[in-house]
């Protein structure tokens, strides 16, 4: 049976990602990355993340999710989709698919349990994809926007990162 992820904002500061391995509870850093937090919360509230999967799992590094294209069984496009939940000045205001988040770098380090925004080579290209560090990754500091942390469920993150995966680090089964 397929297990779909469903992200639900419980209150102002906590979100829950439900997976077949259990729940991951996230706390947000509104003070250091307000636009990233706002975009993530809006996506969670409007169902954007419902049915998405963790499409990239790298042991000793991180798990990545938040791509709306992972709702499809076609893995070839997994990891290529997603945009900001509203217009933050990057992209074309009348074309939602082009909306990106401006970088909000801080002194917060990428340690185990940190929630950060995935992006392309362009620092101002964050959209909806996020990752959770399973180990310290200080080489990402000041290059990727940290916007929260896991407050409960790191054992779930550890189970996800250990899942069998293909050559593209996409889990064999939907998570």
Locate the predicted segments by residue.
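Cyclophilin-like peptidyl-prolyl cis-trans isomerases
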Residues: 1-175
């Amino acid at each position: 049976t397929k297990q779909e992820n469903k992200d639900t904002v419980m209150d102002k500061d906590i979100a829950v990602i439900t997976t077949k391995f259990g729940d991951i509870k996230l706390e947000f850093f509104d003070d250091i990355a307000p636009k990233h937090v706002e975009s993530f919360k809006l996506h969670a509230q409007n169902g954007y993340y419902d049915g998405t999967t963790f499409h990239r799992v790298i042991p000793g590094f991180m798990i990545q999710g938040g791509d709306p294209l992972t709702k499809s069984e076609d893995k070839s496009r997994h990891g290529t989709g997603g945009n900001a939940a509203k217009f933050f000045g990057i992209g074309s205001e009348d074309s939602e698919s082009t909306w990106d988040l401006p970088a909000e770098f801080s002194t917060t380090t990428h340690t185990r349990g940190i929630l950060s925004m995935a992006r392309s080579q362009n620092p101002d290209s964050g959209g909806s994809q996020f990752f959770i560090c399973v180990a310290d990754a200080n080489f990402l500091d000041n290059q990727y926007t940290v916007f929260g942390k896991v407050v409960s469920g790191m054992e779930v993150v550890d189970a996800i990162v250990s899942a069998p995966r293909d050559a593209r680090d996409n889990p064999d089964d939907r998570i």
